[in-house]
Each structure stands twice: as C-alpha cells, then as structure tokens.
C-alpha cells in the first residue's frame, strides 16, 4: 500500500487539518507531473520545498502535538483535583481517630456527590486515554510521512550534494512529538482509574502498582545506546561491581583472560506485508516476534533455539522456546515435521508431565503461528555480546552488544531472493563463516548500527545507586523501546513498510553529552518524576516509587566504593547540592 493511502486511512477526523500535507509536498516535488516537458529543478524550487517541509509542515505538527499534549496534562490534573476531596475523606475515615484530634476537617462529599464525581472522572479518563492513543498514532504517522517525503525528494531531486533526508532526521530529533514519553501520564491515569473504580464499586483496595511489583519476581529492563568513545569507561564501571560472564546457554562461569566475547546470531521471521514489524512498532496488544538464535558459528554445531516472544505490557512478556537441530528447521517451517523425535526423547527421560506438555504446546503454538501468518526468515542480526552477572545471582543482569549488523535474509523478491526460498538461512554467509564487518554482502542488504547497545535487567526493580548513577550519566543515551528486529527492518525494508520507529532520527545526532549538561537534565527529570508521583500519592495510599530515593547496596561491594572517574565527581556534586 502506498504511503499516501496509509496516511489518509490513519487520519483522526477531528485533527484532519493538523496532519502533514503529504499531497502538497508531493505536488511541490512535481512527482506525478509526467506530462511536463521542462522538469528542471531550480534552486528556487528546492528552497520552496524545504521551506514548506520544515518551516510550515514540521512546525505545524510540532505545535499541534505540543499544545494537545499540554491539554491532556491539564485535563489529567483537573481529574486529580476532583478526586482529591474524596481521597482525603477516605484517608481520614481509615486513620485512627486520634490522628485527627484537634484538626479541622473539611466537609466530605455526600454519597450522591461522591458517586457523581467518580462517574464523571471515569468518563473523562476514558476520553483522555483515547486521545493519548490517537496522539501517539498521530505522531507516528506524521514522523513516517516526513521521512518518506524526504526520501522521495532525494530520489527524484537529490543526490549526494542536495540530499535533505539527514537534515530532516536531524531536525526531527529535536522536536517533542517523536520522543515524548507518555509513561508518567499513563501512570497517573492508572492510579485514578484504580481509585475511582474501587470507590465506586465498593471493593477492597487492591495492591498498588508498587506493592504488586514487590510481591512477585519480575525484571525491569532498561535499554541504552553507548557511543564507542564511552564504551570502555562504561565497561569498567560495570566490571568493578559485576564480573564478565561467559555467555553460553548451557553454562555460566566467570570469563578467563584468554576468552573472547561470543557472537550471537538471530534470524527474525515476518511475512511480505511485515505484519509482525508493524504490530511491534505500533505497540499493539500481544505483539509477537519469532526468531532462531544461536551462539558462535553455525559450522560449530551450536544449539539453535526457536523463540517466540509476546509483549503483554510495557515491561512484561510471555516467552516460548525450544531447541531444534539444523536439519529439522526447514521441514518444521513448512509444516512437514512436528518435532516427534524430540518429544519422544523427552518422554523417555521421565520428564514431568507438566514440562512435557509445555514443550508440546510451545512446538504447536510456534508452528501454527508460522502457518497462520505466512512467516518466513527475513532478517539476520549479528552482534558480539559482553555479559556481566554474578554466577548464581540473578538480581542484576547486564549485557553490552557491539559490532551490530543487520542483513537481509528474505526471499520476498522472487526474481532476486537474498535467501534460497527452499532453505531457512543464507548459506553464502554461514558456509563461508562470514564475520563482522561482512564486507562481501551486497550494498542494500547490509546495515550496521553505530553504537553499542546496553541492556540492564534489575530484579523486582530494586534500586542500586551505582546503576542509577550510570543510567543517568552522560555516558549513555536512553533508548527505552529499542528493538533489533524493528531497527533492522526499518533500515533494510523501508520501501516495504509505512511506519517507522521514532529513534531513527536520533541516529543522525551525536549522542555524546557534556557531563554538566547531562547532570542538569538528570536533576530536572527527577524533579518532574517527583511531581508526577506526588500527584497520585494520595490515591495510591502508599509511598510513591521514586527513582530519586537513595539506592540499595550493590550486589558486589558498596556503591560508595568508587575511584576517580566521572561518577565520583558527579557524586560529589550531588552531595554538595544536598548540603
């Protein structure tokens, strides 16, 4: 489907006039005017196009997003104000009588008034939630439109000298509509929904978000980009607390000096319409991805894992996985083999009935998922991983991926397939044991990533001061929703998809930061977090979960055990500010 059609279908009618005028920009490019004899593209034409694109269309979208988001925040605050008298009345009713002795109590709303307020707030929350979803869709489709029209310009009117796509990406990296974090606002809405419903329906107070997280084992994942200039310092900060771990699916042990970090290969699946990609970019409920993954070279006969991950919420997912031998992968994809031998082996090992059934379910689910969605291997991601973790201690798990390369693995173009359609992987790569930087791969089939990818997984979202310091330092660039699968598809199949991840424009900027500027941004961010958490504190009736509180002890040693690095100087500044 052409992007112009996609844009028309995506328009939210009340905001129609505020979208990028894609048709007008195409007209300025004279893309569809094939009857015109003189197709000369003058400097005046170029200036008029760029002015309309950046000064008019981009400015229009930016201003609309900014004003709409502020209105949503104002509407949210108004709902909190309406609920405040009810929240205070609930707290006073639950508190011991002596707690309020001598205190002047404000009159509580009557039962009828309370119900009216709660119903009105719930109705308004539904409208706010709907508008937030529409605003996110609005931002994404406009972001994609700017990238698409810039590419059209470069193809028809550009060249190495007059290419504007990098300039457009750079401009968009600075505007809020492509990097707005809606999470704090959603957290406030969630608290009000919970409070209003339990008071309207008379239910016992359920566990707050903070309490429910503390009551179960879960991991909170934080993702960052690391500029190669900062990579060594980041590694040394981590390895002073956590040892480098040999990354192997069967064993875990501390790495020895002679060992190299292993390479990891993932082959991702999708269909010719890139349905799985679109679902993931648009954050659809139960968006899934499917991949084959192994460590090292395929010629070394590594264990190959079939893995399906389904996102349930922003921080939780359901995983299904099982090992499969090389020779069975293609028949499994085609539905000719159903892992009978593997099931038989497990049955003979006296595996528990529950584990055996789970294994069978994973096999059946993944095979039907392939068939129902017409999936094929489309993308290879290859990278080198350094892992940090105390063996046997999973409270903190950190990985750093470098030399990240994406390679087309598809057979979508029947005339020029990148992969033999009758095979599950590219033998020109694996038989030749190609490695980074994959110089033999044809142009257009390879994309590399300029930064290292840092991933920090913390059990139960526990705070560690040294991790908090690292995450908020100038050494890393936050990339909360970064996905290798999404980035690879967006980089190599941009003509096949009509939606892009917001982080693409950020790649055009220098992610290195001045330490002082980064520190000031951190303080402003924490102040904003505190304000948002304070707004819902009375509704949650529990201590707000703030990242600004002192961290816990490191899994290895004390967080105060620091050397003369940047983080030392940063800690000194924080101490001075608190004094």
What is the predicted role of each segment?
Residues 1-579:
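Phosphate-end processing signature that detects enzymes handling 5′-triphosphorylated RNA
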